[in-house]
């Protein structure tokens, strides 16, 4: 396999983002169509609560933790013998397939009993969960296949696969827009199960190609027992983390009956930069650093991590400022259509601004964790994650009782995210002295990026004040709106005009001030694996 370096890392990230971008784009279209035709009522909130519960149950079985445990061990076995690695993956896949089926059957039986004892909105939530639950089996197998394809550097199909679900979702909502609200919600749940089956099927060709490389049974057979310890810690951490998310949803419901919808829609937007780029870098970085560890190339691993941290900070600083500036026009474009009320739009904007502070630490924390996972040290990041989740739940309950605003849940999450990053880096510096000053060095080198981005934001707001268009970015504008933003075209025009203004100012300042990290972001050559356009 080709040696890992900054160029190969960027090429792999480019391929992953190409597929993931289309999935996220269809996801945004899904949000627009869903808000336009299904609105914001308790039944839709029940649907989102059931949908969130499905992912909670899937992650209890491992979810993303599977890759963290599997990839370093798989790369270790492949370095010894390809047959051992192939046999191990077969065992790994069978185990989680059978576990997912058994787990689903048990939960389905429990939900059926519970469902027979309740009525009202809780009955709807439970029934939707029962319908959606089988999709968790295929979500699990998609995750298992994805871990293998990441090791094979086949990132495009993995990133593209979720778009199958989104396209099915969009088509169903559009076709069922005139049906009875209750029937169309339950029909959508059935279609989503089929969509998740197709998502899993997209990953099959790459998996079958790998398994065809070696069909012989190795003399030394490796059991998945080697992963029991890291998976146990991971499942505990993931379970508490998902419990934290569910706690957020139920607390939001306690504050406001439609609160889960506000939280869900804002989280979907907040996760866009984190999942599209932050976790994309981590997905590419973990196999690369694992190979560096197996080959004893510690300097190469240091360089890869430093490069990844700098790149991620540059992107996330821009994303954070963009989220603060464009929360209102962006939410208008996505949701302020049809039967979706303006009060819900404003509530989502306030929650979204609370989440903006979590983008940078949430993107950096997985990169720091890669240092531990690559050395098969799963204990530290898992324990830190558990502590952060527990603290977050405590802060959420306190904030909920004191403020009684859904947005307070988002601010608590942002605060805890920075604490989690600080704890992770402190532990990394203690156990790996070589990396001790790397995070501080990264933030120091990114100072110019932060200053340039803040200047661009100030200039953008200044232009809004001069042109009397502060209603674009502020819920309570400083000037009287020149015209109401009712039509979709008007909303899109304002959003893209504001975005173009900010980005043109940003990259104009970057060129003027020679902010290299920002200039790299718009260099196609850089993203294809070349060096800085300023150096060239």
UniProtKB/Swiss-Prot annotation:
Its main location: membrane. The keyword Transmembrane applies. The keyword Transmembrane helix applies. GO terms for biological process: cell wall organization; peptidoglycan biosynthetic process; regulation of cell shape. InterPro entries: Membrane_Transporter-Flippase (IPR052031), MurJ (IPR004268). It is a multi-pass membrane protein. GO terms for cellular component: plasma membrane. Keywords: Cell inner membrane, Cell membrane, Cell shape, Cell wall biogenesis/degradation, Membrane, Peptidoglycan synthesis, Transmembrane, Transmembrane helix, Transport. The chain crosses the membrane at residues 12-34, 54-74, 95-115, 122-142, 155-175, 185-205, 226-246, 269-289, 311-331, 354-374, 382-402, 406-426, 454-474, 493-513. Pathway: Cell wall biogenesis; peptidoglycan biosynthesis. It is found in: Cell inner membrane. It holds the Pfam family MurJ. Involved in peptidoglycan biosynthesis. Transports lipid-linked peptidoglycan precursors from the inner to the outer leaflet of the cytoplasmic membrane. Belongs to the MurJ/MviN family. This is Probable lipid II flippase MurJ. It comes from Chlamydia trachomatis serovar D (strain ATCC VR-885 / DSM 19411 / UW-3/Cx). The gene is murJ.
């Amino acid at each position: 396999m080709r040696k890992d370096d900054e160029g190969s890392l960027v090429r792999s990230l480019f391929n992953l983002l190409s597929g993931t971008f289309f999935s996220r784009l269809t996801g945004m279209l899904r949000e627009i169509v869903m808000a336009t035709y299904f609105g914001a009522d308790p039944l839709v909130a029940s649907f989102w609560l059931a949908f969130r519960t499905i992912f909670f149950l899937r992650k209890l079985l491992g979810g993303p933790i599977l890759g963290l445990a599997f990839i370093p061990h798989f790369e270790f076995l492949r370095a010894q013998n390809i047959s051992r690695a192939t046999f191990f993956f077969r065992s790994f896949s069978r185990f989680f397939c059978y576990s997912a089926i058994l787990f689903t059957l048990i939960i389905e039986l429990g939900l059926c009993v519970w469902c027979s004892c309740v009525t009202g909105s809780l009955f709807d939530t439970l029934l939707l969960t029962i319908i959606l639950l089988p999709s968790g089996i295929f979500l699990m197998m998609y995750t298992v296949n994805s871990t293998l394809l990441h090791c094979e550097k086949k990132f495009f199909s993995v990133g593209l696969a979720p778009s199958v679900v989104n396209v099915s979702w969009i088509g169903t909502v559009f076709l069922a827009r005139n049906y009875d609200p209750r029937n169309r919600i339950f029909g959508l749940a059935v279609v989503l199960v089929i969509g998740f089956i197709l998502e899993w099927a997209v990953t099959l060709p790459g998996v079958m190609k790998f398994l065809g490389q070696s069909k012989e049974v190795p003399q030394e057979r490796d059991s998945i027992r080697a992963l029991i310890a890291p998976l146990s810690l991971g499942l505990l951490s993931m379970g508490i983390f998902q419990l934290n998310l569910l706690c957020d949803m139920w607390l939001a419901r306690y504050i406001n009956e439609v609160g889960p919808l506000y939280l869900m829609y804002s989280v979907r937007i907040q996760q866009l930069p984190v999942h599209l780029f932050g976790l994309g870098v981590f997905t590419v970085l973990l196999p690369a650093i694992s190979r560096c560890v197996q080959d004893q190339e510690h300097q190469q691993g240091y360089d890869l991590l430093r490069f990844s941290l700098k790149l991620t900070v540059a992107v996330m600083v821009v994303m954070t400022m963009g989220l603060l500036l464009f929360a209102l026009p962006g939410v208008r474009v996505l949701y302020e259509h049809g039967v979706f009320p303006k009060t819900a739009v404003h509530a989502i904007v306030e929650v979204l601004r609370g989440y903006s502070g979590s983008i940078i630490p949430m993107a950096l924390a997985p990169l720091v964790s890669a240092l531990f996972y690559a050395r098969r040290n799963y204990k530290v990041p898992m324990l830190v994650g558990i502590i952060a989740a527990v603290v977050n739940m405590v802060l959420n309950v306190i904030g909920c009782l004191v403020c009684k605003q859904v947005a307070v849940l988002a601010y608590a999450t942002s605060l805890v995210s920075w604490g989690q990053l600080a704890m992770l880096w402190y532990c990394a510096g203690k156990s790996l002295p070589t990396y001790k000053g790397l995070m501080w060095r990264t933030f120091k080198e990114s100072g110019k990026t932060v200053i340039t981005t803040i200047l661009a934001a100030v200039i953008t707001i200044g232009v809004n004040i001069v042109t009397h268009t502060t209603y674009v970015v502020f819920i309570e504008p400083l000037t009287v709106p020149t015209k109401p933003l009712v039509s979709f075209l008007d909303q899109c025009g304002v959003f893209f005009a504001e975005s173009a203004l900010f980005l043109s100012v940003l990259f104009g300042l970057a060129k003027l001030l020679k902010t290299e990290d920002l200039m790299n972001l718009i260099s196609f050559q850089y993203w294809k694996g070349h060096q800085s356009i300023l150096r060239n």
